[in-house]
Amino acid sequence: IVMCTPTATPPKWLVDASPDMLAVDSRGALRRFGSRRHYCFSSESYLLQSARITREVAARYGKHAAVAAWQTDNEYDCHDTTLSFSENARVAFRSWLKDKYGDVADLNRAWGAVFWSQEYRSFDEVDPPFQTVTEANPSHRLDYRRFSSDQVVRFNRQQTDIIRELSPGCDILHNFMGVSTSFDHFDIGKDLDAASW
């Protein structure tokens, strides 16, 4: 048996209890419950609940003789779900930028923000690259994709760490989408034993 963590589709009761886990699209519209992959990788409340259910399932089945391997979540980025423009993502992105650049002047230089008067006075002014009148700054968009990829890696790593603790010796894989480019598959792969599609 390959056991899969049940985190790709948070149930309605959990969404109702922690609505901040829902993703937001680039126009600022909430991605509501009713399908799958409706969570935001930057939601700390969902990260906590994902760890909780992963721990419960791995504790219960981790040493069962029939369990040959584990799969984390399912199909990261299916339905264009890596990028979220939620308040959680905004806060996490600002922190990521502070860690990367240290000073907002360095960010402005790296992004060529003088063009079209896009300079920032502090990291607290930087939002995710929401849909704009025309194309947003390409350096801004690239950094947001790198940040978002790091959020997926963090989410996946949390699950692999728990599974390795509670189900030692079992391989861990992820069922990737074939042509997704919104996150770094190789970074995710560092925490896996196999990749599937």
Regions found by a protein language model. Give the residues of each.
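Hydrophobic or amphipathic alpha-helical targeting/insertion segments
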Residues: 1-15, 56, 60
